[in-house]
From Swiss-Prot:
4'-phosphopantetheine is transferred from CoA to a specific serine of apo-ACP by AcpS. This modification is essential for activity because fatty acids are bound in thioester linkage to the sulfhydryl of the prosthetic group. Belongs to the acyl carrier protein (ACP) family. The keyword Phosphoprotein applies. This is Acyl carrier protein. GO terms for biological process: lipid A biosynthetic process. It is found in: Cytoplasm. Pathway: Lipid metabolism; fatty acid biosynthesis. Pfam families: PP-binding.
């Protein structure tokens, strides 16, 4: 499973949205219906899945699915 697929899987599971709606441009809050707690839980799920720590200042910059994919590629490769 590619990094992108793993990210989509986590988002679909955490937010209960269909994978078809999870595009790189999709914003967690506006497009996928996440609230601030959902976003925190997503960040924690990404940290656990990929074995990294995402500092708060980085987490605040992650607004879209593409943002998190690019961030994770930078940190873990993929």
């Amino acid at each position: 499973m590619s990094l992108e697929e793993r990210v989509k899987e986590i988002i679909a599971e955490q937010l209960g949205v269909e994978k078809e709606k999870i595009t790189p441009e999709a914003k967690f809050v506006e497009d996928l219906g996440a609230d601030s707690l959902d976003v925190v839980e997503l960040i924690m799920a990404f940290e656990e899945e990929f074995g990294i720590e995402i500092p708060d200042e980085d987490a605040e910059k992650i607004q879209t699915v593409g943002d998190v994919i690019n961030y994770l590629k930078e940190k873990v490769g993929g």
